[in-house]
Amino acid sequence: MRMMFSPELVNPPFGDPGLIVDFNVERRALLFDLGDIAGLAPRKILRVSDVFVSHTHMDHFVGFDLMLRLCLGRPTSLRLFGPPGFAAQVEHKLAAYTWNLIENEPSSTRIGSTRRASCT
């Protein structure tokens, strides 16, 4: 029986946190926490459709820049999910870059927030 997904730690147990879950039946993956992702092959990073960040301490968010660099200009969306205030933190990181080299590139960035719902 073929597994539908393959979970893999991004780094050794005492390295930056990260778990990638690659869906074997689809061309996509989920990434939980965005620590140091330099050890992942670019082709694997490009499969990521959704990133879930638990909090933005450096060891959980330092991989954002590499993810951004690889995903700029790709035709598919990358969705980021995080704790309250996360959208503003992402917006500040994006604002810190000079974007003059990609003026003619078709790209779209949407930043928004959603609310958490709970059932009791």
Give, region by region, the residue ranges found by the protein language model:
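Binuclear metal-dependent hydrolase catalytic cores
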Residues: 1-120
